[in-house]
Amino acid sequence: FLNALKNFAKTAGKRLKSLLN
């Protein structure tokens, strides 16, 4: 479960960076 949460955070972070750029 924790691993999935980390993976989700990584994906969200990448999408946020893409939107900001």
Curated annotation (Swiss-Prot):
Expression across tissues is: Expressed by the skin glands.
GO BP: defense response to bacterium
**Main localization of the protein described in the UniProt heading:** secreted
- Give the GO cellular component terms, alphabetically: extracellular region
- Subcellular localization: Secreted
Q: Which domain of life is it from?
A: Eukaryota
Which keywords has UniProt assigned to this entry?
Amphibian defense peptide, Antibiotic, Antimicrobial, Secreted
This molecule's function is given as:
Has antibacterial activity against E.coli HP101BA (MIC=6.4 uM), K.pneumoniae PTCC1388 (MIC=7.3 uM), M.luteus PTCC1625 (MIC=4.7 uM) and S.aureus PTCC1431 (MIC=5.3 uM). Has no or very limited (<3%) hemolytic activity at concentrations of 15 ug/ml and 60 ug/ml, respectively.
Q: Which family does it belong to?
A: Belongs to the frog skin active peptide (FSAP) family. Brevinin subfamily.
Protein known as: Cyanophlyctin
Species assigned in the record:
Euphlyctis cyanophlyctis
